[in-house]
């Protein structure tokens, strides 16, 4: 009888300030998209686990909301708590920074990381966007002095550059353990949650600078239909009447584009036909009300 093959499994937190490319890195590490991305900061509002199983190795990545100093609204406070609490009980932290930029928010993150017992890997993202390459090496030396990093790796998550190096380091730091999830799992989140995230991503991509932080999505219906697909009803909540008009657009043009793009992404993710209907409703003050936020699925606890 052959010896049982050893398996390795571990949790890896991906942290950093808003808009440094954490979700793009997660998607690249997984080889497919599960965490929404946009060029706007704070696209990620929830912690999302991405699961990558390859042979005996299962890496469970935790993509976190961006840590930031500003906590003016209840939603910002919850997002900060969600990101901070992800740092407990992980085997490794990947700290993502952006090119040659270093901000007060980066400083705040590194201050939190210094007290951790687990190793911290520094990923310098978007190095392909650094126009003056002579600044890169001195900046890497500056970053190396901030704390005792396990390693410092320059990457481009968007282009996949050196992401395999990150994955290799992750595998080396995984403890011997049974896998937590079946090998075909790519996330711990439900299809209903992923549907709401896909709609929110399209809202952020197609609407103006201000609106996305006053908008959230609630899935009111997610049911299989007789054709082997899904009927999905999404409720888009905004804070003001003017925002509702912005989401709907002239003669419904904007919400039609958002709905079409979201449906196509859902069909790719769920590998089934989707019938999607969207509504827009005004619910003033939702982003300042912790009780309302929790009812909409915003929480600082892992689900």
UniProtKB/Swiss-Prot annotation:
CDD domains: Era, KH-II_Era. Residues 42-46 are annotated as: G2. Residues 207-284 form the KH type-2 domain. GTP binds at residues 16-23, 63-67, 125-128. GO terms for biological process: ribosomal small subunit assembly. One of its GO terms (cellular component) is plasma membrane. GO terms for molecular function: GTP binding; GTPase activity; ribosomal small subunit binding; rRNA binding; small ribosomal subunit rRNA binding. Residues 63-66 are annotated as: G3. Residues 155-157 are annotated as: G5. An essential GTPase that binds both GDP and GTP, with rapid nucleotide exchange. Plays a role in 16S rRNA processing and 30S ribosomal subunit biogenesis and possibly also in cell cycle regulation and energy metabolism. Monomer. This is GTPase Era. The gene is era.
């Amino acid at each position: 009888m052959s010896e049982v093959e050893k398996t390795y499994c571990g949790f890896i937190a991906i942290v950093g300030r808003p808009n440094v490319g954490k979700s793009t890195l997660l998607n690249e590490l997984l080889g497919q998209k599960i965490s929404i991305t946009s060029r706007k900061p704070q696209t990620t509002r929830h912690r999302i686990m991405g699961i990558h199983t390859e042979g005996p190795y299962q890496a469970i990545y935790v993509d976190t909301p961006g840590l930031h100093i500003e906590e003016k609204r209840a939603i910002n406070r919850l997002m900060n708590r969600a990101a901070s609490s992800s740092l407990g009980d992980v085997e490794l932290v990947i700290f993502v920074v952006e090119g040659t930029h270093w901000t007060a928010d980066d400083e705040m993150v590194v201050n939190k990381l210094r007290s951790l017992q687990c190793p911290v890997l520094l990923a310098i993202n978007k190095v392909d966007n650094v126009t003056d390459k002579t600044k890169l090496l001195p900046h890497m030396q500056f970053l190396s002095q901030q704390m005792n990093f396990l390693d410092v790796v320059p990457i481009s998550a968007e282009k996949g550059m050196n992401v395999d190096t990150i994955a290799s380091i992750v595998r080396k730091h995984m403890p011997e353990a049974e896998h937590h999830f079946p090998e075909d799992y790519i996330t711990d989140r439900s299809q209903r949650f992923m549907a709401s995230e896909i709609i929110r991503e399209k809202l952020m991509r197609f609407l103006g600078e201000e609106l996305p932080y006053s908008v959230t999505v609630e899935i009111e219906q997610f049911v299989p239909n007789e054709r082997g697909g899904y009927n999905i009803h999404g409720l888009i909540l905004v804070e003001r009447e003017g925002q509702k008009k912005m989401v709907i657009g002239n003669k419904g043009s904007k919400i039609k584009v958002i709905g079409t793009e979201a449906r196509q992404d859902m069909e790719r993710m769920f590998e089934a036909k989707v019938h999607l209907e969207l509504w827009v409703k005004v619910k003033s003050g939702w982003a300042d009300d912790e009780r309302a936020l929790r009812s909409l699925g915003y929480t600082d606890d892992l689900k």
